[in-house]
């Protein structure tokens, strides 16, 4: 219960935290973690409000990247506290976990489709991670500037870019060429609302030609292309995180305060209303996809995109972004969450900026906001980041885009690249084979068109990418009946209804 004991009206925030047991040399843990929050209504002097904040036991699990290679809820006492902020405790209780719980293949977390296990070992690098052991005894070593900037020989041996990437090297002889150009008479609107794995989708995908799929993949910048054979309408997508601008018409909307300003309110209802406003404006402009919200971390105060991102705290970012996403989805506009992932530096971000990160840090901090949004919002899309994850481009990183995003989190939607400028690593073949679906280009370049259109592996990748795009589009505002048939105005519908009624009489 929150009571206003002051002399003027106001709001307050109920913040719930947990403190997990820490073993020196064991799994690294923060001393205190935000588990939930809610903001009061406007309370008059002496007015009270009763609020409830809940979370699951598994939400207190930490990721053990070294031993179990899974999320682990260690046995011990967990302090649950209401606080004014991360430091000032108002009230506390203790929960005791009698036995360690490992969320492995026999006991995955309730929100996972597949068990979470190490997928990013290749990106761990050789840096020293900061540890709580002995009161951060390794602080100087962990925060010291690097002295060696050379790429190890074993990484050079597997490093690829447009100069040495050959899609045929990765062809699978066991792949079977899919059907293309079939006449099954299934239109895209026929699969609206159907499950991603419904057999009707196979009949639809069999109808696409290689040329149609390539057009959908290669020219996905600010649009998805028309495919007349399946009655696929052209859709428009637009930037950016706090305003809508149509790149084709230059029509734009009002701009809202930055997402970090929104986060500082701790107001979930306001985040939802912000999403509604973005969705409504996009809908009124006939825009179906929104290049936002952006939810990378404020890793440093001078991050080049900090104005687009919510917070330095992954939980706050995930909660506020999820509410924003669900607000936009109310208008049938699919948010394109960006920049997935680890995009916290603008300088050289598209030119071989290699980000090295251990699995625990990746999952508990940098991936968490995206995970929360994907699991809480249906029919989303994502924009992959320009940076490298280890030695792999994030836009062509199967462990990230397939293993974690789709297999573990259960994402069903499409992934677009960041701005496509024929950089040294941007190659459509490589990207669609590793989990991306559309190239953010509105013109033809050397590498945004798929080159391997004759192998079974190549065409299967095109089919998968096309399905991901179509699944998102058909479940959006673009395929609402009034948008699909805009010529049928309300007065026409009224006349038809009247005629039917007269016939029935």
For the regions a protein language model found, what residue spans apply to each?
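Glycoside hydrolase catalytic-domain context in secreted enzymes
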Residues: 1-64, 71-87, 109-505
């Amino acid at each position: 219960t929150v009571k206003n004991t002051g002399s003027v009206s106001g709001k307050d925030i109920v913040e719930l935290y947990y403190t997990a047991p820490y073993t020196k040399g064991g799994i690294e843990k923060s001393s205190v973690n935000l588990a939930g929050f809610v903001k009061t209504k406007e309370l008059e002097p002496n007015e009270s409000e009763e609020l409830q904040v809940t979370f699951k036991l598994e939400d207190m699990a930490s990721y053990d990247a070294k031993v179990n290679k899974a999320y682990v809820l260690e046995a011990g006492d967990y302090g649950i506290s209401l606080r004014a902020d991360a430091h000032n405790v108002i009230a506390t209780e203790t929960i005791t976990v009698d036995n360690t719980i490992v969320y492995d293949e026999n006991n995955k977390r309730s929100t996972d489709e597949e068990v979470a296990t190490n997928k990013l070992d290749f990106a761990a690098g050789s840096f020293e991670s900061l540890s709580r052991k002995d009161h951060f005894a390794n602080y100087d070593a962990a925060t010291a500037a690097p002295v060696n900037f050379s790429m190890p020989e074993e990484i050079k041996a597997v490093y690829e870019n447009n100069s040495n990437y050959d899609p045929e090297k990765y062809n699978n002889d066991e792949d079977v060429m899919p059907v293309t150009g079939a006449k099954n008479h299934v239109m895209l609107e026929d699969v609206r609302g159907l499950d991603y794995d419904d057999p009707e989708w196979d009949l639809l995908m069999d109808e696409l030609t290689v040329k149609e799929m390539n057009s959908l993949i290669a020219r996905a910048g600010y649009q998805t292309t028309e495919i007349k054979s399946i009655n696929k309408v052209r859709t428009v997508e637009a930037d950016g995180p706090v305003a809508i601008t149509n790149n084709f018409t230059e029509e734009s909307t009002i701009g809202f305060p930055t997402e970090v300003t929104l986060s500082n309110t701790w107001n979930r209802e306001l985040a939802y209303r912000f999403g509604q406003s973005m969705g409504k404006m996009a809908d009124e402009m006939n825009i179906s996809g929104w290049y936002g919200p952006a939810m990378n971390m404020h890793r440093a105060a001078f991050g080049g995109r900090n104005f687009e991102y919510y917070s330095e705290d992954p939980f706050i970012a995930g909660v506020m972004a999820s509410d924003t996403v669900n607000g936009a989805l109310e208008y049938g506009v699919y948010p394109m969450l960006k920049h997935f992932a680890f995009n916290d530096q603008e300088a050289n971000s598209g030119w071989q900026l290699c980000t090295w990160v251990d699995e625990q840090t990746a999952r508990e901090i940098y991936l968490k906001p995206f995970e929360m949004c994907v699991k809480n919002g249906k029919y989303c899309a994502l924009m992959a980041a320009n940076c490298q994850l280890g030695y792999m481009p994030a836009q062509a990183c199967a462990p990230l885009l397939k293993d974690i995003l789709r297999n573990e989190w259960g994402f069903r939607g499409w992934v677009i690249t960041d701005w496509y400028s024929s950089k040294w690593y941007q190659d459509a073949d490589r990207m669609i084979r590793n989990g991306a679906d559309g190239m953010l280009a509105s013109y033809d370049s050397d590498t945004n068109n798929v080159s391997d259109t004759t192998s079974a592996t190549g065409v299967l990748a095109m089919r998968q990418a096309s399905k991901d795009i179509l699944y998102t589009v058909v479940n959006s505002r673009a395929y609402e009946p009034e948008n699909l048939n805009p010529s049928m105005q309300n007065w026409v519908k009224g006349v038809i209804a009247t005629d039917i009624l007269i016939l029935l009489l």
